[in-house]
């Protein structure tokens, strides 16, 4: 038995309200690189499904840039660490790690030789550091600012120059190498969010919260012209590959393209979803990529500012997932209430129209042509999968915090922290208070039976008779609070996962223990799924691993180590040899399984 990772459906860039998002591109314009939670994502532009997830940072990542040679990536995080690693080979070997500053890295850039790096941010002793990529030795001093530095850009050709942008409303200009302070350019009246050299190094431009763009000579730092560009803050600026134009993105939902020689406006694109545009990159002459505050990537054609494509994904931990009956679509929901529908064949996400949950989605299940969701906003909601939207009038207040939901006959069983509710057409039929605190629920596929797991380490078996609940049995073989339950598709087995990482397998009819030796996880079981033949059980755990257990050979299992760096949350079988998994890293992974 073995498994292999086939593909990764990547998370979108991590963003913060009213803060710029840094996105890098390689010199060929074929790939982009960006931070996502504690990972760095390298993604092909043409084939978005082709991506790599770098998981070696121990703190949330903030920025990543390709070296001009294209062989290395430098990435920074919240703890001030910069990691330089090989992005060309399969092993992604670490070249060096440097603690540049004592706080959050906001931006970094390479010189033209791919030998020196300047990293800036929110330090305590200093706001920036210039060092060599291979040894970490200092190659100058980055000083002169009195507040956090938001951006840095280096001139790639000689004579080397560098410019930094700060919250102290100034741009500092440096001569190199070694990099020494030359002068401070105090032209902005508010925070300066971005500064970028043109690809031909003749000029650099700055943008800030005052809505203005200033363009300077690349060698001397002398101001060339000023543009009153946007009404709101400008978060990002990026040059076209031929240096003839540049693009700005703003808090006013607009993206504007400017003539670099005259400073005149060429064209403008206004976002229809009314989200702040916090990042932009111009990788090729025919493509601009814009990032909004939700992390969604919009591909624009610079010639007419028409949308070519929009890439959706999750930013936060994926907490719930379910598969459509025909296994063509995968529905996922995250900690921030984002719900997406993934086309499995295209490996592409689409947003659902309508009002979603306002915070964490606890569980999703299929019920006929609908997806039922419950969230920590104490509501149950219904998604019409044919229309691709939330049903406007189908919102049911749960009363208490919901724990789980399942379908029995024509009813929904809603389990909260205090009771078990029976719903028919989103109308309460009956309610039963519990003397224990429920923690999980699952329904039998062939009978009017369901089970509820409790924090008291017990599983309670219920039947539904004419809308009334009837407890028929208890299973008390777990030694930790129950976290996950799953009946096999043929109805023969009941798997019970707990907070210690152990899975107990029961005979669903006799309630006798078949095996209690599936105890190879070291963390809480968060998700379980049976294959269609009811021969193998896949489990997802907080310990970052995914295991596949065999009913016929209980001690034989497949271990997918470090499947999701921050914890695996859900698993679903697409076919007998293909598995989908979700994680707290906001990624979805496709696995090939061989028995």
Swiss-Prot record:
Q: Which GO terms describe its cellular component?
A: actin cortical patch; cell division site; cell tip; cortical actin cytoskeleton; cytosol; nucleus
For the biological process aspect of GO, one term held by this record is: actin filament severing
Q: Which UniProt keywords apply?
A: Repeat, WD repeat
| UniProt-recorded Gene Ontology molecular function terms | actin filament binding; actin lateral binding
Tell me which PROSITE patterns the record gives.
Answer: WD_REPEATS_2, WD_REPEATS_REGION
Q: Where is this region: Disordered?
A: 1-21
Tell me the ranges holding the WD repeats. 56-95, 100-143, 144-184, 187-226, 229-268, 313-352, 356-393, 433-472, 477-516, 520-559, 564-594
Q: Report the SUPFAM superfamilies cross-referenced here.
A: WD40 repeat-like
Report the Pfam families cross-referenced here. Answer: WD40
- UniProt similarity note: Belongs to the WD repeat AIP1 family.
* Record's protein name: Uncharacterized WD repeat-containing protein C9G1.05
């Amino acid at each position: 038995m073995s498994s292999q990772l086939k593909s990764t459906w990547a998370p979108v860039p991590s963003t913060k309200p009213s803060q710029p998002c840094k996105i890098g591109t390689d010199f060929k314009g074929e790939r982009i690189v960006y931070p996502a939670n504690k990972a760095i994502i390298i993604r092909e532009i043409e084939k978005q499904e082709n991506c790599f997830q770098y998981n070696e940072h121990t703190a949330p990542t903030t920025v990543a840039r390709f070296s001009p040679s294209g062989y290395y990536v430098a990435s920074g995080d919240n703890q001030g660490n910069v990691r330089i690693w090989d992005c060309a080979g399969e092993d992604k070997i670490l070249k060096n790690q440097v603690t540049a500053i004592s706080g959050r890295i906001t931006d970094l850039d390479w010189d033209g030789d791919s030998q020196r790096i300047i990293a800036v941010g929110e330090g305590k002793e200093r706001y920036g550091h210039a060092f060599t990529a291979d040894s970490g030795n200092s190659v100058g001093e980055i000083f002169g600012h009195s507040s956090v530095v938001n951006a840095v850009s280096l001139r790639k050709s000689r004579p080397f120059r560098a410019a930094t942008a700060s919250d102290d409303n100034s741009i500092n200009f440096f001569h190199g190498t070694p990099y020494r302070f030359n002068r401070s350019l105090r032209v902005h009246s508010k925070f300066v969010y971005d500064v970028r050299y043109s690809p031909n190094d003749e000029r650099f431009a700055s943008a800030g919260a005052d809505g203005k763009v200033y363009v300077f000579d690349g060698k001397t730092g002398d101001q060339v012209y000023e543009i009153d560009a946007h009404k709101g803050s400008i978060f990002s600026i990026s040059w076209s590959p031929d240096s003839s134009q540049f693009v700005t993105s703003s808090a006013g939902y607009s993206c504007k393209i400017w003539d670099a020689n005259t400073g005149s406006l060429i064209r403008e694109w206004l976002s229809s979803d009314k989200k702040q545009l916090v990042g932009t990159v111009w990788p090729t002459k025919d493509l601009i990529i814009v990032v909004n505050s939700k992390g969604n990537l919009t591909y624009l054609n610079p010639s007419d500012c028409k949308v070519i494509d929009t890439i959706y994904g999750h930013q936060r931990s994926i907490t719930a997932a379910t598969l459509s009956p025909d296994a063509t679509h995968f529905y996922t929901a995250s900690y921030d209430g984002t719900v997406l529908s993934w086309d499995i064949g295209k490996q592409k996400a689409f947003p659902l129209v309508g009002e979603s949950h306002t915070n964490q989605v606890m569980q999703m299940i299929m019920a006929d042509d609908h997806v039922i969701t419950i969230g920590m906003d104490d509501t149950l909601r219904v998604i019409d999968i044919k229309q691709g939207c939330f049903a406007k009038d189908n919102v049911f207040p749960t009363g208490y915090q919901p724990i789980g939901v399942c379908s029995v006959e024509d009813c929904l069983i809603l389990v909260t922290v205090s009771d078990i509710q029976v719903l028919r057409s989103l109308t309460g039929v009956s309610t039963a208070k519990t003397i224990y605190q429920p923690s999980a629920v699952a329904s039998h596929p062939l009978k009017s039976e369901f089970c509820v797991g409790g924090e008291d380490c017990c599983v309670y078996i219920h039947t539904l008779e004419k809308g009334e609940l009837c407890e028929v049995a208890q299973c008390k073989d777990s030694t930790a609070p129950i976290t996950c339950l799953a009946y096999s598709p043929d109805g023969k087995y009941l798997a019970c996962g707990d907070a210690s990482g152990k899975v107990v397998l029961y005979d669903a009819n006799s309630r006798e223990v078949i095996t209690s030796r599936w105890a190879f996880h070291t963390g809480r079981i968060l998700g379980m799924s049976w294959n269609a033949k009811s021969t193998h059980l896949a489990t997802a755990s907080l310990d970052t691993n995914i295991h596949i257990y065999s009913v016929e050979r209980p001690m034989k299992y497949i271990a997918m180590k470090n499947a999701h760096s921050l914890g695996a949350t859900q698993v679903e079988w697409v076919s007998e040899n293909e598995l989908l998994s979700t994680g707290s890293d906001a990624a979805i992974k496709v696995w090939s399984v061989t028995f």
